[in-house]
């Protein structure tokens, strides 16, 4: 679905704002880890707080670009993005690195590409489960773990309510998951 900014300089600005805020968020979380490791808890906390602010800014711009859909659409978009990363992006990066004399980096790009391939497969499997109503019910016995308290249940269906912490599956759909 196209957004109202399609083809405009404003759309490019929104994309750049989203990208910049997203990168800043990651950088600040990396910086927080270093500050914490060096014993600067207050500085680490400030980096993390700012990273959370940057996340909200990125979300705001991404929403303007109509980048957030329902779970089905989000799984499809995520799978497509991962496909691009492993089939085109990282392979292209690897070839360039080889041509420029960086074989170790080329190998690393390809290894990350393999991880992205796994990510795509996982998203496509989740999408299939969603489309076939097999998110909380499987055709064979599975181990289910409550994401809230860790209680384990074995069966073909996740419990609607965790018998330990009373979390409702319908209230927090992703709180119960199949372990296998």
Label the model's feature ranges:
Residues 2-5, 9:
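N-terminal leader/targeting segments
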Residues 146, 162-165:
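Short cysteine-rich clusters marking metal-coordination/redox-active sites
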Residues 89-152:
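A broadly conserved sequence feature marking short terminus-proximal activation segments
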